[in-house]
């Protein structure tokens, strides 16, 4: 196998029909009669680096798209004549809405039609919608928000399939480090968005998205040749009827789930614009619960290939869902409202905010790589508690921070600690999920957790925005604005306190389970020695 060329149509060889699960959890098993060859294990250094960079670009572009508008909301809104904070927040929450809602479906489409194909389609879609977001300057704010919402579909297709590609192409040890680099690309993408967003705005804000479109178009072309076909893809292309395809991708369950998530999120975020006095807002909320009930019924009673294994969800998964949602929703609140405080009250500039947040670049990469090394040696429940404590400390520091305090006190330490929280909670949650479900469902762990992560960020902003509007007295003065911002940060403190308690309970439960397991092993050894 040549390691010096990038032949996209190169396919891994294998001796059976048993390929790894979606994220490679079972891919490391080899027997004499059933051997799976990991194609990327045989790559040379240059080819391997290009492959990893291409796959990790999905997380990079995901975070880039989320953060490139964070500190430029006011400038973008001003060009459209929009100053309402509720309408401006749709720039972020709209992107997160579609991303969080469609990740599971993106993973299922990759299972059915090929991970590489869906990855490439996702990159192409992201490039086109990024161009649309820039061109919307000539069309109006609704078109801009529509473009942002459609942008979220791109990472929803690329992120889960990037994880699948990594899992199928690498054996266990290089796979773990590949996942670590995947996580490390998140702070790099976030930092790029925070830095280049304001820089391009100094020229003209549409260049934020036009430059993104050009970069993603390059990755689109590179992914065609840099990513090999998965060995199972030829098998997935066998002829199936339309009904069989729809059944395998769980179209009915997916439609009910997506509708429920979209309506629930829309109700909370649109309430910032129209308030709860508008009938259509709370009608959407009621309908979301009805569709959610329909989703659970379909997954439990109807679907032969459920998109989410509702029947096997346990208390362990409930704990990890609660911790993940609490932590990452506060991350969205913290990032959005701390930037608003600094820009609108503290007088800092967007470029200055990029400099203040720059430590996430170093600590993010370092934490991700360290966690990649220790994740198999330290109980995931302990790592989750550590992450939730970091979330809590970060939220508390930012809620207590005086507006005009120097950078090296509250802000610097909160930024460092927040990075520890993010890069340790995600792998811990994925492992806990994988350990809590039957083996055939372990491969979807990353997709499920990413769904919780991204959807929580978007929904958390909706909750926080409701609190802000209720207590800021209209936001006519800086004091009123600050009061509303502070309220959202204290809300994040409460969320992280709740998540920390959940993580502590789960840790105690896990320690008790481990103790019982050790006792049982010792008793079995004693019985066997007596025999």
UniProtKB/Swiss-Prot annotation:
InterPro entries: MFS, MFS_dom, MFS_trans_sf. Keywords: Cell membrane, Membrane, Transmembrane, Transmembrane helix, Transport. Residues 1-11 have a biased composition (Polar residues). GO terms for molecular function: transmembrane transporter activity. The chain crosses the membrane at residues 86-106, 117-137, 145-165, 179-199, 207-227, 249-269, 280-300, 319-339, 351-371, 380-400, 402-422, 447-467, 488-508. Induction: Expression is under the control of the terrein cluster-specific transcription factor terR. Coiled coil: none annotated. GO terms for cellular component: plasma membrane. Residues 1-27 are annotated as: Disordered. It is found in: Cell membrane. CDD domains: MFS_Amf1_MDR_like. It is a multi-pass membrane protein. The keyword Transmembrane helix applies. SUPFAM superfamilies: MFS general substrate transporter. It comes from the Eukaryota. Belongs to the major facilitator superfamily. Efflux pump that might be required for efficient secretion of terrein or other secondary metabolies produced by the terrein genne cluster. This is Efflux pump terG. The lineage of its organism: Eukaryota, Fungi, Dikarya, Ascomycota, Pezizomycotina.
